[in-house]
Each structure stands twice: as C-alpha cells, then as structure tokens.
Regions:
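Low-complexity, Ser/Thr/Pro/Gly-enriched N-terminal "stalk/linker" regions
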Residues: 1-41, 52-101, 148-150, 178, ...
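Conserved aromatic-histidine-acidic binding/catalytic patches
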Residues: 31-38, 59, 102-106, 122, ...
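Aromatic- and histidine-enriched alpha-helix N-cap/loop-to-helix transition segments
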Residues: 34-48, 105-113, 159-167
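Active-site groove signature of glycoside hydrolases
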Residues: 108-120, 150-158
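A surface/extracellular/periplasmic glyco- and lipid-processing/surface-interacting theme
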Residues: 128-190
Length: 190
C-alpha cells in the first residue's frame, strides 16, 4: 500500500505495514518496535495532533476519524473486530498488525489524550458524536483507570505504581466540565 511504502521509507516498517488493518482506519507505528507495533498512546497523540493542526486552510478531520476508528476497532477485548461494537472502552495498549492485540489492558494516559482530542474535535468541527464518544470514554476511564479516591491507575489491568506523568490535571478539569461529575475535580487535586 502507499502508506506501507511511506513507512518503509521513513520508519523501516515493511510495505505490508497496514495490510491487515480494518478498512477506513489509520495508525501510528511505534518507531522503536521490532514488530510493526501500535500503542494506544500513539493513537491518542495522533488524534490530538490532527485536531490541533486543523484550521481553515488545513483540515485533518478525515485523518482524525481514521485514527479514532482504529481506536474503536481495538477497544479493550475487541482485537480489531470491534469497529461497530465499541461501547466506550479504552484501546488495548499494544497492537501488532499481524497478530492483533498483544497488550493485556489499556494505558490511562492514552485514554486521557483520546478523550481530550474528542472534546476538542467537537469544538473544532461541531460534530456532536465526538462529544458523545468522549463522554463514553471518560465514564469508562473513571471506572477502569481511576481509583475511587481520584488517583490514577497506570491502566485497566494493573495498579503496580503511580506514574506522575499520568496525572493529567487539565484533562480532569475538562472532563468535569463536560460530564458535570465532581469526581474529576477530586482527581485534579489528588
């Protein structure tokens, strides 16, 4: 594919890098991967970039939508088959293009970034489905990536350590504004 050729030129990935991807999706390949690996943080960063770089002259909404669809296809436990059955969950944190999901859980920072990107996409492009998806993801994140006291877990399947870079105070305040859930004010001050 054309995308595979681009990755081969600039990242060392094979021409078949996107061969098994669900239709209408895009992904970010981890530059350090020995396999053609995508991590959920890369999708979240890509979504943020597409929405923040869009303006009247350059509109990246279609690229944003492809990244968001990839997230939905690889929602926790869906392994590329969830494109039409996503119910709000975070994305499996590692996806190998050849074998599917290989990360056993989600990464909190990716959920925070993707939810912020969806809120900003709603503000940028006015499509209310972005806001509805953001609310679903925020609620899922609260139930799976957060402690009841507002502290952040590293992801949905582990709670082994606190990573200060996962405390996304600005996002938490935005989540409170969007959901009207006081929990996020607690998270912002925890």
């Amino acid at each position: 594919t054309e995308a595979g050729q681009f990755y081969a030129m600039y990242g060392g990935a094979s021409e078949n890098a996107n061969q098994r991807m669900p239709s209408g999706t895009a992904r970010v390949i981890s530059p350090n991967a020995k396999v053609e690996l995508t991590v959920s943080e890369g999708i979240g960063y890509g979504m943020l970039l597409m929405v923040y770089m869009s303006d009247a002259q350059n509109d990246y909404q279609s690229e944003f939508d492809k990244l968001w669809k990839y997230w939905k296809c690889y929602g926790k436990g869906l392994n590329g088959n969830g494109c039409n059955s996503w119910s709000g969950q975070g994305m499996d944190w590692q996806v190998d293009n050849y074998t599917g999901s290989i990360g056993g859980g989600t990464a909190s920072d990716a959920e925070f970034d993707a939810a912020v990107a969806l809120i900003m996409a709603y503000k940028q492009w006015g499509n209310s489905s972005y806001l509805e998806d953001a609310k679903k993801l925020i609620n899922w994140t609260k139930s799976n990536d957060m402690q009841s006291d507002g502290s952040v877990r590293p992801g949905s399947n582990w709670n082994d350590a606190f990573n200060p870079s996962y405390s996304h105070v600005g996002a938490f305040k935005l989540f409170q504004e969007v959901t009207n859930d006081a929990f996020w004010n607690t998270a912002a001050t925890t």
